[in-house]
Amino acid sequence: MIRMSLPFRALGLGGGGVKGILHMGALYELSKKQELVFPDGVYGVSVGAVIGTYLAFGLPFDDEGILKLKQQFKLTNFVGNVDFNCISHSFSLKGMLTMDLFEAMIVDLFESRGIDIRTKTLGDANMPLFIISSNLTKGKPTIFSGNVPVLDALKCSCAIPGIFVPQILYGQVYIDGDMFCPSVDKFMPFDNMLCISLKKKMTDIKITEQTIENMSPLSYIHDIYTMITQNFHNQVKSEKTLCLNFPGLSSMSDIDEFNVDDILTKAGSDLNSFLGAKGLLQELTK
C-alpha cells in the first residue's frame, strides 16, 4: 500500500467538464486541513487544468472565489448556445466551435481577481504548474510548463474532440488532455500527493442494438469517447486517486438543474471518507 501523509505536496486534478465543480468542493474541504500550497506542483487536465491554474496562481477558495467559480461552471460559458446547424461545418474544421468564448471566460475569471492571465506563462504561477494535453502529432500526452502561455496551454488541454476545433501550438496539433491522460497520477512521480478524478461514473448510456439507431452522430462520438477514457482510467488509476461523482451530474450537464451546495458538500464528504480510509484523519487529531 502506498503511504500518504498530510500535508500533500503535490496535487493532480483530472478532467470532466461541468463535473469540475466537484474539484471545488473537495479542495474547499482540504483547505480546512492544510494550506492549499503544493511545492512539488499542481498538475491539471482539461477542466482540472482550469481549476489547478486558479489555485497555482494563489487565488483563494474563499466564499467569493467559490461563488465566482460556480458562476463559470455553466455549460454555456464554455460552448455558448450551440447552433447545431454548424455540425456540417464541423467535419471540415474537426470541431463545431472555436475556443474564443472559452478564452474569454478564463480571462474574465482571472481579471475578477486582478490578474491579466493573457500576459502570463505557466512559469509565472506561485507554485510549479503543469498542464497536460493530448498531442495528436506525436500520438502521446504532452506536459506543458515553464514559458508556455497559460491561455494556450489551457485551450490545448480543454479542446474536447468534436466540440472544439483542435488547437495548433508550436506546429503540433492538440486536443483535450483526457484522451491520452485519463488518470493524471501516472505523470506525477510523488508519493505524498493527492489526485482527484471525476471518472467514478461517467455515463448512464447503454449502447444497444435498439438505442444506437436513435443516437445522433454527436452523441455517438461523445459516448464512445466517454467509454474509452473511463475504461483506460479504471485500468491505470492508483491508490493515490480520489474518485468523485454526484448523482445525475455529467460532463455536459446544465448546472442550473442541480443544487450546487449539495454537490460541494458531497465532494467534501467524499474527500473525508477517502482520507479516513487512508488513516490520514487520525493524523490531524494527534
Show where each model-derived region lies.
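Patatin-like phospholipase
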Residues: 1-45, 53-286
